[in-house]
Curated annotation (Swiss-Prot):
Transmembrane intervals: none
Region Disordered, residue ranges: 18-47, 60-269, 322-458, 545-717, 749-783, 798-830, 842-956, 972-997, 1081-1151, 1179-1305, 1318-1343, 1355-1459
Keywords from the UniProt entry: ATP-binding, Kinase, Nucleotide-binding, Serine/threonine-protein kinase, Transferase
Matching SMART domains: S_TKc
Annotated InterPro entries: Kinase-like_dom_sf (IPR011009), Prot_kinase_dom (IPR000719), Protein_kinase_ATP_BS (IPR017441), Ser-Thr/Tyr_kinase_cat_dom (IPR001245), Ser/Thr_kinase_AS (IPR008271)
Protein species of origin: Dictyostelium discoideum (Social amoeba)
Gene Ontology CC annotations of this record: cytoplasm
Polar residues biased stretches: 238-256, 573-582
Protein kinase domain sequence ranges: 1476-1744
Family as reported in the entry's similarity comment: Belongs to the protein kinase superfamily. TKL Ser/Thr protein kinase family.
PANTHER family assigned: MITOGEN-ACTIVATED PROTEIN KINASE KINASE KINASE 7
Record has Kinase as a keyword: yes
UniProt-recorded name of the protein: Probable serine/threonine-protein kinase DDB_G0282963
Amino acid sequence: MKDNIPTGSIIIPLNHHPQQQQIPQQQEQQQQQQQQQQQQQQQQQQQQQQQQQQQQQQQQQQQEQQNNNNNINDNINGNNNSNEIKNTKDANITNNNGTSIIISLSPPPSPALNSSSSSTINSNNTTISGGDNENNNNNTNNTNNNINNSNNSNNNNSNNNSNNNNNNNNNNNNNNNNNNNNNNNNNNNNNNNNNNTNEEGNKTNINTTNNNSQNININNGINKNTRNNNNNNNNNNKQMTPPTFKNNLQVKHQPQSSSGGSIGGSNKLSLSKRVKSTTSSRASIIDSIDIDIVFNSLKNSITSKNSFVLGVHRHRMSSISSISNTTNETTTTTTTTTNTTIEDHQIGSIGNNNNNNNNNNNNNNNYFNVNNGNSNNINNYNNSGNGNNNNNNNNNNNNNNNNNNNNNNNNNNNNNNNNHFNSYSNNNNNSNSNNNSNNNLHGLNNNNNGVMESSDFNSDTVGRGSIFTVSNSDVNSDSNVGLNQPSFNDLTITCDTLTETDEEDLMEKFLEDSDPDIDEEDDDDDFNEEEFMKFQTQFLHNKSQNSSLNINNNNNSSNNNNINNNNNNNNIMAGSTSSVIYKNSGKPPLNENNNNNINNDNTVCNINNNNNSNNNKSNNSNNSNNSFKDDISSDEEPETDSDTEFKNNHHTNYHNSPKNQKHVDRKPFVNSKNNTNTNTNTHNTYNNNKNNNNNNTFEQQSNEDEESYSGSYKSSQNSVIYKPNLVSSPNFKSSLSSSSLISVGTNSLKNSPFPPSSPILSPQTDDPNNNNNNNNSNTTISQPLPIALNVSIESPRAFYNSGSNNNNNNNNNNNNNNNNNNNNTNSTSATTPIIQAQTHPTTQIPTSDIDTSNSDNNNNNNNNNTSDNNFNDYNNDYNNDYNNYETEFLPPKKTPPPPIPTKMSSTPPSSTSSFLSTSSVTSVNSNNSVTSSTSTNTSNSSSPKHSSSQKSKSVFSKIIKEGKKRLATKFNSHHHHNSGNNSSNSNNNNNDDEVPTYIHIYRGNGDESWRVKVTSSTTVRDLLSMSLTSTVKGEPPSLKLYLTSSLNSCTCVSSPNNLSSAPAVSSSSSSSTTLETTTIITSASPSSSSSSFTSPTTTNSLNSHLNHSNNINNNNNNNTNNNNNNNNNNNNNNNNNNTDRTNSNCTCNVNKPEKELNEDDKVLSVQKKWSGPSIFVLKNNCTKSSSSSTSSSSSSNNTNNNNNNNNTINNNSNNTGTRYSVSSITSESSEQSSNSHNSLNNNNHNNNNNNHSHNHNNSNNNNHHHHHHHHHNNNNNQNGQQEGVADSSSSSPWSSPALSSPSKQHSLQYFENIPTLALDSTNNNNNNNNDTDSTSSNMGTPTTSRRITTIFQKQHSRNNSSNNQNNNNINNNNNNNNNNNNNNNNEHLTPLSNSTSLSSASSISFLNSSNGNNSPNSNNSNSNNNNNNNNNNNNNNNNKKTTTTTTTTTMNSNGECWKNAERPRTGVRWISSTDLFLIKKIGAGSFSKVYKAKYMGEIVAIKVLKGEATSEQIELFKKEYDILSLVSSQNLIKFYGACKEKKLRMVTEYCQHGSLYHIMSKRKMDISWPLVFKWMHQAVDGINSLHTMRPALVHRDIKSQNLLINSQFDLKVADFGLAKPTELQTGSNSTIKGTMAYCAPELYNGISYSEKADVYSLGIVLWEITTRVITGKYQRPYEDNTEISFDFQIVIMSSKQGIRPTMPPNVPPKLSYLIQKCWNQDPNERPSCQQILLAITSLYDDYIYNPSRYNDLILNNDLNN
């Protein structure tokens, strides 16, 4: 194997990993060749398909290129086009039996690694590809194409404008081309920069342009839309499948003499690398980097935005020639890059050019992207390797769209928001250069003349060493990437260059050399300090001198600001390993043309990613550049002036730094000579001094001494660079874990002494005299927003947030702000554990420490509120609003923000690790995924001793040695070892490692349960936060978690005597007990104190109940007052203690022990202490007032209105009823039950009056009033008695009230205010109240008043409650407080009842019913609610859940905070199978069978679910008996209950005559007109009872087969399997259900179901009945239509052609008109069910008035037949 190693190769040891398979080189080459062959075949097919399109594009582009080439050829050195790149070689990578990786730096003796890989050198274009990257097919006309690549890559207005200043004649043509052919230019640029977009993996396409500059694009196989052909290069880029690499590295090398580089590995992704080279540099020595560390770490830690140090590469210093063509080095994983220079010109070398959004978004792993254009200026360094690249890709595309509109550039380089260096020119008229610059952390503002000495920009002078850091930037903020689901698409290993100045710096405390013989050859004899300083001043100190910027060309600066705002999202390298970022200092050796020069002061990057962070820094402005003096020498380390300036500068990053800090060299600030900027914009002139640094995140560290900076270099080049301190010092101040070298988090520098905005940066910041009159910095300066400090921070931090004033791009700014929050998720200490909200259902963070309101974060994003550390404690003592929190608590720079409650963490403030990444908290809110910084360098060991005998080589060898030992654990986010921190932090860190425990939590009375993953640190608050939805921020949760032993129901049947003396039980303690027969939760009921006794006939029981009501009212008043004092929890507990009593007569497990858990209790800890079985039950907290009252009512108001509140509360409770009838199981069939229910309500009413008058002791009056109203209600409710339903001994997991069937007694009901439906076919006004009959004078059609005839409606006592609840719902709507809760809980209101009286026609949609004297009470409650400013509603919330022992319970509606998806199931009456006796089978359906049976002596029908039923059918079956348990109407099928034993069975009313379809099909059956009108009315009335529920219930399957006829020939609506509430109707619910002939035509168009769809179906049913009675035979709909052969044609033809069933000839005109109105094509033109009922009543009146006319129609028809 050694014989095959070419000379000059670098052998890198590669440790074998047990989980990684080592593939020999030959085998791998064979596999690659096979893949390449397949890919070549695919290429050929793709080429044939693309040839025609490519030819057309090539022709057009070549013409443009020829024109552009003439201009470029004249500009670039006159005759540089003939230069060729030599010594182009493919790096030969071999895997020596899994032991080492060999990188061949010299031409290999054999062909390239991949047979299809080739290096085609044609003139100036060199394409180097490896694997299947075959872009070299058609490299013709390379000279011209390369020049045009450079031209077209920056063929934007900016570069062309800059060329206008230099080359007037040529640039005019270029401008024309740019303006007229932007799309073409953009396509050209896309083609130039197009990478072979891979379906799988990475490919690198190196297109050298303009002699020796190179354009390297790397796609990670993400974007499949970037398959643009390199038409300019005549390269037909094919989408190929890349070779599969295991442990070996895919290295692409193009040296010119010798080169050096670094490598990294990945087990998921082939790591590609170009080794940089210079003409005069020697081969670099790569220290032994343990690739196994990479693999192991990638496997374990690269799961989120994590990073770790891979190793160190030592650069070999060399002398620099005057014209050295240093190529740029770009890798997917490892980079050490510099710029490419050519004499007199700065060449665009690398990257995704301006006009390829997709490529730019995907090329986030490029270290440098330099885009050069005609103007010989560096337009863009687009560097990535940053963690949150994907987070902002979409928004960046939007930003580019804004640029497209204003700058005529379809695609700008703004996509690479995570770019590391941004070199740009400010010469564009449309400020495109600023757009490009604002994308990047630092820009090299190059001269328009572009003259840059190669010695100033040489890769070898970058530094002595480079730290390679691995990071994963492919975790999208909107994605749900879990801890075990890493995405390696953007896995990068970035290079951080280290610089050293003298040997003393090598004697740092944290390292000692144990291997002095390592790297002996790496002496620094060739280090050229003078040349390094030239490079330092030019490359590191970002200074732009643009002499050609035109003032009039900044018209779009405000739009650019928006772009800048958007682009600054990822400028922090949030989620990236910090590559080399340098300070804006030093004077570049560029030609300085002082013509309106704009000094783009790219200051330290903004870690918190404020929208305008780089607006303030890199825009065209009159900034005085902070540069260092030209006479800086390598030996001098002056400390003068800079300390004072730092101290006085409010922008400095060292507010609290000591004066005499030795850790950094500070040179005096000098203003740039080119500060004159005549370019102003009136939109931005108001942006003053603070703009440059407003958005910079400042970390104010205190108590920092010289020891805290032991981990930093001090260099005469004034570039302070973090040392890779792998061993943490005890104070943890300067360890590498706080450096973004290994920490991806944007706030990872929180413990760093250096500015957070520049992780590897000298601490000098902008000059205090910086003024930004920049026309591109359209920003407003906001106050510094406090960050809720991690407890590890000893001093305050505040970041300045500048909001964007640009109104044109608000949406983009909002999106970017969201991305800012995403980026700020990483603003954590390096020791923060990763918390995945999506993955872990139980987060370990207390809810009080988390702002769980997503909407708040989104709103704050509009204001650029990236203060992710703001908390809203759910504790009432910390109930400040989020926005108020940000605006009110604005501490001074040295004043810490408001203290966080101590329960956040037990870690003291002095601890260096935080309990939680506050940015992770916010990311939970905003994006449902958390990306936290990697916990790094929390080492247990102390720093090694200082050794004075070691040289620089020892530093790097020690780093590698220490890295091998510690990287696998130190930089794994799941393993944190920090002995210096408190144990609480270590516990938090170890929570991810502990085995999760799963518990079951039951809701209420056990109706539902869910499995929850908890850990030892999971608190009750965490569980509540997962199951609650709070409408008001900071609202205390209204649920309590109880620990109990059993969910069994009470089996005691207490007698009335027992009940009479039983005290009332507070709902707060027993409202959620699992009592099916005694405690019934009706969560929709807003009634507060309405409780029903079984037989409250004695005075004692009444007095007891009254006293209970008084106590509750008093408590409510206290709660109302205490809401403003934020003491709800205490008062609620008091109420619970006062009323929490159980019936002593009950001997069952109702008295089982239970414990209410506090929010701070640890779930598992409490469970361990519990004796016996432990069951967690969530119960509603009855006494908590509405959350909205806290913010809307004042304590004085509450105090003044207490009495009125008491009165109003009970009025409301009296008038509001439950969703369904509530009665004791022992009195289901008793007449006394409903009377008792109503009497108690009235008794409460009188009691409230007594409370209002303060006559609490007048029990006799109470009794008197009670009996009075008792008898009064008996009279009104005589027809409302409930038929008995026998008891079931089986307990139900779903508690339900006893459901009653309607009685046979009827009462009158009037529809006085419903608009009448004009049945005259000549009258088009449906709502004409002056309707008259113009068809026949003999008919004597009654007028509107006469049509208000009686409609038989069966009455139920439960309907009285329903109406009252609707009234109360209206009250809440007026008060704007509890609308959501009431509406949610009123979903299943029963609509109609007796004696409906409506106040206005607006009540057509639903009919509220009131019962007798209860109606005025409802009106009183309305007025009281309005007058008391929402206090009544709040008190109602407290009183909603009073219970009586062993009777029924009504749950608070407004206090219920369940999520909609987790609402408790409705009541279902469970029947024991032993009570059912099957008789015979009477029918069968698709998934059920119907039997005739006997239940409790009554004939019933049992619907049995078939065994082969699918899960969907089972759900429909369950839904049907759910709905049947909700509704109760005389025209709906009566529901007795369900049986769940063995098979699911429903017990319903037995209908002897079968369905309407069946009875109409009998030809011998005589159907008369009275029976027709009866069936019509009953069918419509049954559907109307569904539609008038709240929310309305849509049947969705109305047809004659689902309308049943009982023995009395009454019609019953049945089959509710497809019924669904209208509020749950979505686009997916618009799927056509039911029989096609009955489906409304709008359903075919995808419109959701509504009540009008049921009306259409009713119209078809009315037609069927009418046709049957007139013709005497049944006819199916569309039976006579010969064009219809299939059912699905009916829906299509009815929707598209408007066909309808044929109307019989003898149909009465009014009836015909009614039917046609029901099936109208327009749903809005169809009448409501109430209108149809009135119309049918009118028709029946017509029949009664002249029956012979209707009968003659039948007789005439019989004669005709």
